[in-house]
């Protein structure tokens, strides 16, 4: 039975879908003004993991992840680039999809874009005005009346009184309360805009997600997810808008993933301490990056370093060495491993414990391959089956272990030298055999002699 940590209740609770075996999940996606950094990759992989485990467990999941394609940052970047905002977002959306494909991230079932839901935003804003939760001061803006919503702060545990005392908010005479947030922004010169009942303008960030999520999944759905940095104010404001508009619970459970940190600080573009996914993939195999992101618990912060990536690479090499050379088989055996893996994953998607189970399977595969290759092959297939939940170990072992060889060594030359060494060994010319091995080693290649013959991989 799956238990999840619900940020709304600040407790771990048994997951009970609203509608039998069907699960509806919405996750806040990217604001597409630049290439995705590794922090975005963290969120992508975290909710890809949730998606994979829910489906592996037999749930019928509808996964929606939005794209924010109109925003101050987008407008400013497009202006700096001398291009239209939609040309910029089209390029960045394509780049995001390329990054996701390389990290083996499954596509969401729906990927709504904010600019396709302007009419829905108008409708929700008008409902909020009609119910007294929003007001239009006459300058083209529309604001949400925070003080009217009795449940404000229930997600973040922040109190309105404390926010007013602690906030440094610029005076805006058009607001009734400094904490009120914008639902609709009146048009400014040179900015994209849409007509509305309150004049030309564009939506605020928070209303975008309220409308896209409820449009795709209904007024109430099972899971809302995102990075922990979105808990306040974004997700708090989503709840305030949505529940005031519909009179219903917005999302039953809230999942928040941890941040990537560099020297203890959150990785972000605003702090200029970020690495794009593309930067990292220039140096490391995509599966190494994915394993780094998925092997830590999704709610934990990950401290990014070259050492952590090297550790991820070494872990995957252990897995692939165990798989290497075994015949293709159907998953067989390992029922106790499956049970323990499932127990770990059902405990709030506990990937550290799940990975520990996979390493125990590696030890058993290595033990079996010396005495029972058939059993070893069946257990290896089981290992790959479970690892598919993490989105790893789906490559051919040699392909991963030789990754990066292009441009570094001549594979044909290595293969020719291996054949020459085998001939020398067959002729019992041990000196020549050793000389060839030394030559291959000097090329940065490691040889491994086994029952199935000699294989090779790049040295670290």
Curated annotation (Swiss-Prot):
EC class:
ligase
Q: Which GO terms describe its molecular function?
A: ATP binding; cysteine-tRNA ligase activity; zinc ion binding
Q: Which SUPFAM superfamilies match?
A: Anticodon-binding domain of a subclass of class I aminoacyl-tRNA synthetases, Nucleotidylyl transferase
Query: Is the ATP-binding keyword given for this protein?
Result: yes
Q: Name one GO cellular component term.
A: cytosol
Catalyzes what? tRNA(Cys) + L-cysteine + ATP = L-cysteinyl-tRNA(Cys) + AMP + diphosphate
Q: How is the cofactor bound?
A: Binds 1 zinc ion per subunit.
| GO annotation (BP), single | cysteinyl-tRNA aminoacylation
Q: Which domain of life is it from?
A: Bacteria
Q: Where is this motif: 'KMSKS' region?
A: 266-270
Protein's UniProt keywords contain rRNA-binding = no
- Residues bound to Zn(2+) are 28, 209, 234, 238
State the Pfam families in the record.
CysS_C, DALR_2, tRNA-synt_1e
Major site of localization recorded for this protein: cytoplasm
| Subunit (UniProt) | Monomer.
Family to which the UniProt record says this protein belongs: Belongs to the class-I aminoacyl-tRNA synthetase family.
The protein here is known as Cysteine--tRNA ligase
Say which species the protein is native to. Pseudomonas savastanoi pv. phaseolicola (strain 1448A / Race 6) (Pseudomonas syringae pv. phaseolicola (strain 1448A / Race 6))
């Amino acid at each position: 039975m799956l238990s999840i940590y619900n940020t709304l209740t600040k407790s771990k609770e048994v997951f009970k879908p609203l509608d039998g075996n069907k699960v509806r999940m919405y996750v806040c996606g990217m604001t597409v003004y630049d290439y995705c950094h590794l922090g975005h990759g963290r969120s992508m992989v975290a909710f890809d993991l949730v998606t994979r485990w829910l489906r592996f467990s037999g749930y019928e999941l509808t996964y929606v992840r939005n794209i924010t394609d109109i925003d101050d940052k987008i407008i400013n970047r497009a202006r700096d680039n001398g291009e239209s905002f939609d040309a910029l977002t089209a390029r960045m959306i394509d780049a995001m999809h390329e990054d996701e494909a390389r990290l083996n991230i499954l596509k969401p079932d729906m990927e709504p874009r904010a600019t396709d839901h302007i009419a829905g935003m108008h409708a929700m804003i008008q409902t909020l005005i009609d119910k007294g939760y929003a007001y239009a001061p006459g300058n083209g803006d529309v604001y949400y009346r925070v003080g009217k919503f009795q449940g404000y702060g229930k997600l973040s545990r922040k109190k309105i009184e404390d926010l007013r005392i602690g906030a440094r908010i610029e005076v805006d005479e058009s607001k009734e309360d400094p904490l009120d947030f914008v639902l609709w922004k009146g048009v400014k010169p040179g900015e994209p805009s849409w007509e509305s009942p309150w004049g030309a303008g564009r939506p605020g960030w928070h209303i975008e997600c309220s409308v896209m999520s409820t449009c795709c999944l209904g007024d109430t759905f099972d899971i809302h997810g995102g990075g922990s940095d979105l808990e306040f104010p974004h997700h708090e404001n989503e709840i305030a808008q949505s529940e005031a508009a519909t009179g219903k619970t917005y999302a039953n459970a809230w999942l928040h993933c941890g941040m990537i940190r560099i020297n203890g600080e959150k990785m972000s573009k605003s702090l200029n301490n970020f690495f794009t996914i593309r930067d990292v993939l220039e140096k490391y195999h995509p599966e190494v990056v994915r394993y780094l992101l998925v092997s830590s618990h999704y709610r934990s912060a990950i401290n990014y370093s070259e050492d952590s990536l090297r550790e991820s690479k070494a872990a995957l090499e252990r897995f692939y060495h165990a798989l290497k050379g075994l015949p293709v088989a159907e998953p067989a055996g390992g029922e106790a491993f499956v049970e323990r893996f499932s127990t770990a994953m059902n405990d709030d998607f506990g990937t550290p414990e799940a990975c520990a189970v996979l390493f125990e399977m590696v030890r058993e595969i290595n033990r079996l391959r010396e005495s029972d290759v058939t059993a070893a092959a069946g257990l290896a297939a089981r290992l790959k089956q479970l690892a598919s939940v993490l989105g790893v170990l789906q490559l051919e072992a040699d392909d991963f272990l030789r990754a990066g060889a292009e441009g570094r060594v001549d594979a044909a030359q290595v293969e020719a030298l291996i054949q020459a060494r085998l001939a020398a060994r067959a002729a019992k010319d041990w000196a020549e055999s050793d000389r060839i091995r030394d030559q291959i080693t000097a090329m940065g290649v490691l040889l491994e002699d086994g029952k199935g013959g000699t294989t090779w991989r790049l040295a670290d």
